[in-house]
From Swiss-Prot:
Reactions the enzyme catalyzes: ATP + H2O + a folded polypeptide = ADP + phosphate + an unfolded polypeptide
Gene that this sequence comes from: groEL
Protein name from the UniProt record: Chaperonin GroEL
Family the entry assigns: Belongs to the chaperonin (HSP60) family.
Family annotation (PROSITE patterns): CHAPERONINS_CPN60 (PS00296)
């Protein structure tokens, strides 16, 4: 086992603080509307230019092992805030740096670290409760657009696009961000349920100009098996032909004789049919078939539950207002399933999301909710260069997370004002002893740091602005973009409550751990081993010389 380097007490804390400061100083220059950019070098390709706190934090590794530990712990704050609310990473880093710096000063002055931590925790818990009372619900498009604009670094187009997307697909709908092809940002909305499976035979196409199959008010047959024998399907086909409606077959596969017969029937105009493979694989396919059944009011015909295809009737088939199938996708619009059944299914999938362990599973389940709940919107980001595209895409994703957080828990005044108001409301909070009171003061002082940093990045004097904002009340604050004072909510400067809350909680959590650190252990760097090979060679040469 390699030898370890161990540092105790103040030596350890000084090193750790140095690492914290390197990372936080790199991240905090990006805060606010006048935050600066950070350029990140990549081992290949063009450098990335970003104003996203967590992207900067992830790039930082320090050479000194002890300093690096400090930096990594603050990186954890940024990552956690990003995972919880998708934004607020820079605010969380600034808060953590302030709590750690002030907390370690108090420890150096002889305070008890555990009581300091208790004081900090007490202040943060009280602050979170106060934030909830300040929070205003965010439901109208205007407020959603404002949140998106602020989070995308004051880019109004992005804010409006996100508000429009949420308007189209609902608050629960899936909104994805992709690379666009032009210079302008675009919004593409797919209504209804769409899945990635196209028609099984081009002979089903009935709209040659678009190369698509369009079925009006079709019956939908859902089968969790391969269909290769046409006899199994005859009763259903006859019933559908009598009803005079088209039929969409969604099955594990339709092949051989069955597919050929369906194609011939369609071409002769006897019955209008189209067949597609069921989406997904394995258990996910079963679940998605069940989703489609719920949406269309049908039943999945599965041998697992003792149902046979030849015994199925029109009652087992789902229905929709319209179905559009092209080479790669199938879209079911306006299924006739009961609203209560669809809501029940959505609640069930939500429960699975809560229990999901992997991000991949969570994402897939989220997609299923969206397909059932409303639709999918795609924001296509336009940019002139690849570097700009990367930067802009990251901003749009941040803005999207922020607006979701705003819809979930409401909004508070932005620009660091909410934390200042919260701090003044809990200023009288007292702990059980003097050391806890110092911990509370450390947390209260930290709550001013985001506002001070925003002002500093504007090139103004932080103390002057902080005192002016403190002397006001309610949503009165400083608009860093226009450099004027006023009502932040009226000026459209909003922060999602969830983002501010997560930033404060994660910053205090990690800072509390660092203040109570008394010892740090790391591997000793391996010393340079003497290069024996080279020395041996030289000796040989000398010997040769002597012989000659």
């Amino acid at each position: 086992m390699a030898a370890k380097d161990v540092k105790f007490g103040n030596d350890a804390r000084v090193k750790m603080l140095r690492g914290v400061n390197v990372l936080a100083d790199a991240v905090k220059v990006t805060l606010g509307p006048k935050g600066r950019n950070v350029v990140l070098d990549k081992s290949f390709g063009a450098p990335t230019i970003t104003k996203d706190g967590v992207s900067v934090a992830r790039e930082i590794e320090l050479e000194d092992k002890f300093e690096n530990m400090g930096a990594q712990m603050v990186k954890e704050v940024a990552s956690k805030a990003n995972d919880a609310a998708g934004d607020g990473t820079t605010t969380a880093t600034v808060l953590a740096q302030s709590i750690i710096t002030e907390g370690l000063k108090a420890v150096a002055a002889g305070m008890n670290p555990m009581d300091l931590k208790r004081g900090i925790d007490k202040a943060v818990a009280a602050a979170v409760e106060e934030l909830k009372t300040l929070s205003v619900p965010c439901s109208d498009s205007k407020a959603i657009a404002q949140v998106g604009t602020i989070s995308a670094n004051s880019d109004e187009t992005v804010g409006k696009l996100i508000a429009e997307a949420m308007d189209k697909v609902g608050k629960e709908g899936v909104i994805t961000v992709e690379d666009g092809t032009g210079l302008q940002d675009e919004l593409d909305v797919v209504e209804g349920m769409q899945f990635d499976r196209g028609y099984l035979s081009p002979y089903f196409i009935n709209k040659p100009e678009t190369g698509a199959v369009e079925l009006e008010s079709p019956f939908i047959l859902l089968a969790d098996k391969k269909i290769s024998n046409i006899r199994e399907m005859l009763p259903v086909l006859e019933a559908v032909a009598k009803a005079g409606k088209p039929l969409l077959i969604i099955a594990e596969d339709v092949e051989g004789e069955a597919l050929a017969t369906l194609v011939v029937n369609t071409m002769r105009g006897i019955v209008k049919v189209a067949a597609v493979k069921a989406p997904g694989f394995g258990d996910r396919r079963k679940a998605m078939l069940q989703d489609i059944a719920t949406l269309t009011g049908g039943t999945v015909i599965s041998e697992e539950i003792g149902m046979e295809l030849e015994k199925s009737t029109l009652e087992d088939l789902g229905q929709a207002k319209r179905v559009v199938i092209n080479k790669d996708t199938t879209t079911i619009i306006d299924g006739v399933g009961e609203e209560s059944a669809i809501q029940g299914r959505v609640t069930q999938i939500r429960q699975q999301i809560e229990e999901a362990t992997s991000d991949y599973d969570r994402e897939k389940l989220q997609e299923r909710v969206a397909k059932l709940a409303g639709g999918v919107a795609v924001i296509k980001v336009g940019a002139a260069t690849e570097v700009e595209m990367k930067e802009k895409k990251a901003r749009v994703e941040d803005a999207l997370h922020a607006t979701r957080a705003a819809v979930e828990e409401g909004v508070v005044a932005g620009g660091g004002v909410a934390l200042i108001r919260v701090a003044s409301k809990i200023a009288e909070l007292k702990g059980q002893n003097e050391d806890q009171n110092v911990g509370i003061k450390v947390a209260l002082r930290a709550m001013e740091s985001p506002l001070r940093q925003i002002v500093l990045n504007c090139g103004e004097e932080p103390s002057v602005v902080a005192n002016t904002v403190k002397s006001g009340d309610g949503n009165y604050g400083y608009n860093a973009a226009t450099e004027e004072y006023g009502n932040m909510i009226d000026m459209g400067i909003l922060d999602p409550t969830k983002v501010t809350r997560s930033a404060l909680q994660y910053a205090a959590s990690v800072a509390g751990l660092m203040i109570t650190t008394e010892c740090m252990v790391t591997d000793l760097p391996k010393g340079d081993a003497p290069d024996l090979g080279a020395a041996g060679g030289m000796g040989g040469m000398g010997g040769m010389g002597g012989m000659m």
